[in-house]
């Protein structure tokens, strides 16, 4: 996920999924790092590479003592894939309650937003108690809500 401020982009972005192939740490301030993990869903990578990413992500989630939140990015335009569901369930099994970032919100009509969010919730089998934030890198929709949530976590 790329959240930009007026000065810089914290994570490189690409039109092609699967470009992040390592764990990348971005120093935001003295209290906060943003950690970008490899994607899994639409990446054009072979099975061995995806398995390596899975192990890398699992090791990071198990070993990180400072991890406060996991954001799971899912394309709002589609029903959750089996990989999305597996990843959500796996993150929960590791003791985290992921925040769902419903990406590409600018690609659907505003009138379809709630319907698409309901499709995501149904597909993931989650209730309204799970935070889901519609997000667009293009329009910056959801950016402030994400930062507000991060700041709240940093204060706890």
Name each model feature, range by range.
Residues 108-156:
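Canonical P-loop GTPase G-domain recognition
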Residues 20, 50-54, 64, 81, ...:
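Amphipathic alpha-helical transducer elements in NTP-driven molecular machines
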Residues 40-50, 77, 106-109:
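Flexible beta-alpha connector loops of hexameric P-loop NTPases
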Residues 36:
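Conserved active-site aspartate in kinases
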Residues 49-77, 89-101:
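Inter-motif core of Ras-like GTPase G domains
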Residues 6-30:
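Switch I (effector-binding) loop of TRAFAC-class P-loop GTPase G-domains
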Residues 79-94, 114-120:
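Conserved catalytic-core segment of NTP-binding enzymes
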Residues 1-5:
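Conserved small/polar residues in nucleotide/adenosyl-binding loops
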């Amino acid at each position: 996920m790329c959240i930009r401020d007026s000065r810089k982009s914290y994570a490189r972005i690409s039109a092609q999924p699967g470009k992040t192939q390592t764990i990348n740490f971005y120093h935001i301030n003295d209290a906060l790092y943003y950690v970008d993990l490899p994607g899994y869903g639409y990446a054009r990578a072979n099975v061995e590479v995806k398995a390596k990413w899975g192990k890398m992500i699992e090791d990071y989630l198990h070993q990180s003592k400072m991890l406060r939140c996991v954001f799971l990015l899912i394309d709002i335009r589609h029903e959750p894939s089996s990989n999305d569901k597996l990843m959500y369930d796996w993150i929960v099994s590791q003791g985290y309650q992921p925040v769902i970032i419903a990406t590409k919100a600018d690609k659907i009509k505003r009138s379809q937003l709630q319907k698409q969010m309901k499709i995501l919730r149904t597909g993931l089998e989650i209730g309204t108690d799970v935070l889901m934030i519609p997000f667009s890198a293009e329009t910056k929709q959801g950016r402030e809500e994400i930062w507000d949530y991060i700041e709240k976590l940093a204060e706890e």
